[in-house]
């Protein structure tokens, strides 16, 4: 036997098969020196990626030099009686906020909608607990708003909870920066020109509100789209629908829960809420396999079908629904079955706050969840007629 083979055999027999802590050997069985041994990397704890920082501050771009901005300022100076020189001084302090531009861009196509995932974000223990406290702290204002405007307390609680978690997340953008940016530099998108016109109207409303209330317009903080306060009113809605519900002579949607409560109720009453409609805004529904009801979908944000028409098309409510007008609402769940609901005019009044079935349904469900939790009642996973 060759000497090398003999040595190898002796080494292998002397160091039997191996404990896990034995030093590594080469192909002949010789122990490798430390410098040649593979270093075992220590496992590192997974590092959480930090969310990208949002630039709330923006940058100066000399808005006052932009031709369209100058024309806009000329118009509102004439129309609303603003001092043109003061407008120039103000606009020269406004910053361009790219974060607002990025945040208004539509979501990439192809990702399926998922109501169950969305609702878990909006109807959670944090919002529920905060909603109970908000209701308890403001029961008098909620009762008064329900009596005056006909909007149930749970719907008001649902909206303020979905919008800002009862004032916790009201926005960190300077409203004047965000709205000016979107009014004159909206990203490429369908109806870009119409969206810019909308935000120019909101910019005018911001300046009118600031003048009327004696507020420095640069001090207003809100969302990336310029929405303000606990209920996230756009400036034009603030001008039209906000109310001084605490009676102190000023409207403060940021710091006065009473003003926020009364203003939400006033908005819904002005957008079609009907106090005389019995029952909840939605009723769970089943649909027939023949899909004769397809033509009832996507008929606008309005209730237009009677129970008989729905039944004839194969749509049945899980619990008896009053004789009212309804729309058929579909809540998609990705790869899971779609949920179907009959929605009356009050549901569609909520969509005037935010034109989304998911939004309106989350308002209804959060309000219901808070009401039941507050009363100590058991909360089922499905509203099924509320």
Per-region residue spans from a language model:
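Boundary at the C-terminal end of the N-terminal hydrophobic targeting segment
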Residues: 19-24
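Flexible, glycine-rich surface segments
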Residues: 213-326, 334-335
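Acidic/His-rich structured neighborhood in mature extracellular/periplasmic domains
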Residues: 112-263, 269
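Surface-exposed patches in mature extracellular/periplasmic domains of secreted proteins
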Residues: 82-91, 151-158, 217-222, 248-251, ...
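An acidic, Gly/Ser/Thr/Pro-rich helix-cap/linker signature
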Residues: 25-137, 143-146
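Bacterial N-terminal signal peptides that target proteins for export
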Residues: 1-7
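Bacterial N-terminal signal peptides
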Residues: 9-16
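C-terminal soluble interaction/assembly domains
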Residues: 286-386
């Amino acid at each position: 036997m060759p000497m090398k083979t003999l040595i190898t055999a002796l080494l292998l027999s002397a160091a039997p098969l191996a404990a896990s802590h034995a030093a590594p050997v080469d192909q002949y069985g010789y122990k490798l020196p430390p410098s040649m041994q593979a270093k075992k990397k220590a496992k590192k704890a997974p590092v959480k990626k930090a969310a990208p920082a949002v630039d709330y501050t923006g940058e100066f771009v000399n808005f006052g030099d932009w031709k369209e901005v100058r024309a806009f300022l000329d118009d509102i100076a004439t129309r609303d009686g603003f001092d043109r020189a003061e407008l120039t001084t103000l606009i020269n302090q406004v910053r361009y906020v790219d974060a607002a531009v990025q945040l208004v861009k539509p979501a990439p196509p192809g990702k399926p909608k998922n109501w169950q995932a969305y609702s878990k974000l909006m109807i959670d223990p944090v919002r529920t607990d905060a909603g109970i406290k908000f209701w308890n702290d403001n029961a008098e204002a909620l009762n008064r708003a329900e009596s005056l405007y006909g909007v149930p307390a749970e719907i008001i609680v649902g909206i303020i909870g979905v919008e800002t978690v009862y004032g916790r997340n009201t926005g960190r953008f300077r409203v004047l920066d965000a709205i000016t940016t979107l009014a004159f530099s909206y990203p490429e998108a369908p109806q870009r020109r119409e969206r810019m016109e909308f935000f120019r109207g909101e910019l005018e409303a911001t300046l009118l509100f600031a003048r009327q209330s004696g507020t420095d317009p640069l001090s207003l903080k809100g969302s990336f789209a310029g929405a303000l306060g606990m209920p996230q009113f756009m400036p034009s809605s603030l001008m039209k629908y906000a109310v001084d519900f605490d009676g102190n002579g000023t409207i403060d949607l940021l710091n006065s829960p009473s003003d926020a409560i009364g203003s939400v109720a006033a908005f819904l009453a002005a957008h079609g809420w009907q106090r005389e409609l019995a029952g909840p805004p939605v009723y769970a529904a089943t649909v027939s396999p023949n899909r004769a009801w397809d033509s009832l979908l996507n008929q606008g944000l309005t209730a237009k079908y009677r129970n008989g028409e729905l039944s004839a098309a194969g749509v049945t409510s899980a619990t008896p629904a009053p004789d009212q007008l309804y729309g058929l609402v579909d809540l998609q769940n990705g790869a899971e079955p779609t949920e179907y609901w009959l929605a009356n005019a009050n549901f569609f009044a909520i969509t005037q706050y935010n034109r989304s079935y998911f939004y309106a349904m989350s308002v209804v469900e959060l309000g219901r969840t808070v009401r039941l939790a507050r009363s100590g009642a058991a909360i089922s996973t499905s509203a099924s007629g509320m």
